[in-house]
A protein has these predicted regions:
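Short, surface-exposed "cap/lid" segments of acyl-processing enzymes
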Residues: 35-39, 43-66
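Primarily recognizes the serine-hydrolase "nucleophile elbow" in alpha/beta-hydrolase
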Residues: 101-167
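C-terminal catalytic histidine-bearing segment of alpha/beta-hydrolase fold enzymes
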Residues: 214, 221-265
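Catalytic nucleophile-loop/oxyanion-hole region of alpha/beta-hydrolase
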Residues: 55-64, 75-116
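Short beta-strand/loop motif that positions the catalytic acidic residue
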Residues: 200, 206-208, 212
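Mobile cap/lid helix-loop segments that gate and shape the active-site cleft of serine hydrolases
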Residues: 8, 163-196
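Structural cue for short, hydrophobic secondary-structure segments
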Residues: 45-48, 76, 206
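N-terminal cap/lid segment of alpha/beta-hydrolase-fold proteins
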Residues: 1-37
Length: 265
């Protein structure tokens, strides 16, 4: 990360407009956009933190504010997480669906052009963004959102829950998220893992720094390869010497690559 490498996580973000999509304290979104009433191309951002309540949407407010200055309407999703009532399985995942569906009712009020949208998620939020577009339609599967983006950007996403379980990432956080191991909760892993539901069927870019020591780059090399073989339009961008947080730091050298991938509003 640039300058003080913890600044994104510790500095309050520029304010946004808070809109609730449910009754729980964490069921809300933060909307930031340039002044004016015109409908703008919309970026939906899902934050990471390995699904734990210690991390919230505040730290992605910096990148959302930066993109708003560049002409985007941005929406940072908050959701119930491990450690909160209703968090973990299935509430963490169903909150993302509920938040995305709620945006259809907020679009006119805030000038959100959902027909020209991108979804972007970082780390565990990358998992949730990928999950939302790869939802199974099998009977009994978790509810999928009612609309899809034009483009999906995964920033060092946790793209394979079974692999995350095998590697015991972040003190074996998948046990907390899914209530057991992949062997013990096979159906939940199958329903919740993007890698189990390829192809994505949306243009996708995965950005993963070569110095990331939080989510293994090998996981996304494999995921992108499998998605491409399944017929997806997907590519992997690997910024040299970038760590796990450089990709969400608007002061980092890597940020220009993220902006370029998103394109012009």
């Amino acid at each position: 990360m640039s300058e003080d490498e913890n600044w994104v996580l510790t500095t309050p973000a520029p304010p946004g407009v808070r809109e609730a999509y449910g009754a729980a304290p964490s069921q809300h979104v933060w909307i930031r956009r340039p002044p004016g009433n015109e409908r703008l191309r919309t970026l939906v951002m899902i934050h990471g933190g390995y699904w734990r309540s210690a991390y919230d949407a505040e730290h992605v407010g910096h990148l959302c504010a930066d993109l708003a200055r560049r002409g985007w309407a941005t929406v940072a999703l908050e959701y119930r997480r491990i450690g909160e009532a209703g968090g973990a399985w299935p509430g963490t995942l169903t909150d993302v669906s509920a938040a995305l569906d709620a945006l259809t009712g907020l679009a006119a009020k805030h000038g959100l052009d959902l027909g020209r949208s991108a979804w972007m998620g970082h780390s565990a939020g990358g998992h949730l963004a990928l999950w939302a577009v790869t939802r199974s339609s099998a009977p009994g599967a978790l509810k999928r959102p009612g609309w899809r983006p034009r483009r999906l950007v995964g920033l060092a996403p946790v793209s394979d829950l079974v692999e995350a379980d095998r590697l015991e990432l972040s003190r074996h956080v998948t046990l907390e998220l899914l209530g057991g191991s992949a062997r013990e909760q096979a159906a939940r892993y199958a329903d919740g893992s993007p890698a189990a539901h390829l192809p994505l069927r949306v243009q996708t870019v995965v950005i993963h720094g070569t110095k990331d020591n939080v989510v293994p780059l090998a996981m996304n090399r494999s995921f992108v390869d499998r998605a491409r073989k399944a017929g997806d339009d997907i590519r992997l961008v690997m910024p040299e010497d970038a760590d796990h947080f450089d990709v969400i730091d608007p002061k980092s050298k890597v940020w220009a690559q993220v902006v370029d991938v998103l394109g012009t509003p």
